Amino acid sequence: MKVTLDNINNSDTSIFGDWINNSDILSNEFINNKPYEHIIIKNFLNNKIANKISNEFPSDLSNYFKYNNPLEIKYAFDSIKDMTPDLKNVFYALCSNKVTDALKNITKKNNLDYDPTCHGGGLHIHENKGKLCMHLDYEKHPVLENKQRYLNIILYLTKDWKDEWGGATELWDENMKKCIKKSNVEFNSALIFKTSEKSWHGLPEPIQCPENIQRKSLAFYYLIPLENQSNVNKLGN
């Protein structure tokens, strides 16, 4: 999936919630949260667009790539040209200067920029028994030279998810001894966290949702110039 400048210039950043205009006050929470830098933003999008893209979220799994391996069981869809106009606009808006500047304010990383390849991003579905083992994302970008992933956004888009079904994104300590924080699957809330050599995360227990329910999420990433060489021991994409 390639994001072009024309797409970004035509994007509508009014789709976001109030946080977009109050990003400065979120920085301390992001920087000081444990086990590593992260923040959970509720009402990430305005309610109207959140409901629209949830309803438009493609559920036909024949169009998805299926991951079924020891690390993860999930479906991924990243063909932006085949998404609805509202879904496309969300991805384009995430690349806009307004959103990137807000994330710079939160992270205090002034050289932050969006990933134009959206590598590993897109729309994700976990069904019953879906999982994602604890892992570290890559740092060195596998496509873009001299770039590394710095920030990960996961936006939950399933309505009326029940906590007892599992599916929360777990954040573990750097020694992988225990879970420190859980980001529950709450509709229109976004987990934003720094990607590093200690940002262990995942949903390690198989999801126990009903067969007709899907855990739907949108993923997007931001990059910085390469600072660290890729760690060959890392797992993830």
Language model region names:
Residues 2-6, 129-130, 137-149, 158-237:
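Catalytic core of Fe(II)/2-oxoglutarate
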Residues 18-19, 25-107:
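Non-heme Fe(II)/2-oxoglutarate
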Residues 40, 66, 113-118, 122, ...:
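A structural signal for short, well-ordered beta-strand segments and their strand-loop junctions
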Residues 55-58, 94-148:
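Non-heme Fe(II) oxygenase catalytic core, chiefly the N-lobe of the double-stranded beta-helix
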Residues 61-63, 111-113, 159-163:
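Proline-centered turn/helix-capping motifs that create local helix->coil transitions or kinks
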Residues 73-77, 106, 112-115, 119, ...:
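A structural signal for the main folded, soluble domain(s) of proteins
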Residues 152-154:
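Eukaryotic charged/polar low-complexity linker/IDR segments
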